[in-house]
Design a protein with these regions (language model features):
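C-terminal structural segments of small proteins and small subunits
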Residues: 65-89
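An amphipathic alpha-helical micro-motif enriched in hydrophobic residues
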Residues: 30-40, 65-74
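Winged helix-turn-helix DNA-binding recognition segment
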Residues: 59-63
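Acidic, glycine/proline-rich low-complexity segments that act as flexible tails and inter-domain linkers
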Residues: 1-31, 39-41, 45-56, 80-108
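Short basic/hydrophobic patches in alpha-helices and adjacent helix-turn junctions
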Residues: 53-57, 70-73
Length: 108
């Protein structure tokens, strides 16, 4: 666990453990988790915390779009649009962090 991001690292660890102790496939689990994040209007950090597990489960951008389409009639268009923005902000943050880490390694 990184000492720089202990809360985020703990959430990622919890997510990984919950996948390992679940009876559905990791892919189905992450699809359900994505739907839940959208339904509760989760902030970008929640999507960021779940991104490693979603990637390991093999979720694609088409999967994310499919979940958004499937739940839009239930949770409403505003929630789905907000989720899209939150996901984009989370991805932008992840890219910025990755770029900073690469620059730091290059300076070392």
């Amino acid at each position: 666990m990184s000492t720089d991001t202990p809360v985020l690292d703990t959430i990622v660890d919890i997510t990984t453990a919950s996948i390992e102790h679940n009876s559905v496939s990791p892919r189905d689990f992450m699809l359900a988790r994505l739907a839940a994040l959208i339904a509760v209007d989760a902030p970008p950090a929640s999507y960021l915390a779940n991104a490693p597990a979603a990637q390991q489960a093999g979720l694609t951008s088409q999967d994310v779009e499919g979940v958004m389409i499937a739940i839009a009639p239930v949770v409403g268009t505003p929630r789905v649009v907000a989720a899209a923005g939150h996901i984009l902000r989370a991805l932008g943050f992840a890219i910025a962090v990755g770029d900073a880490e690469m620059a730091e390694e290059a300076d070392s």
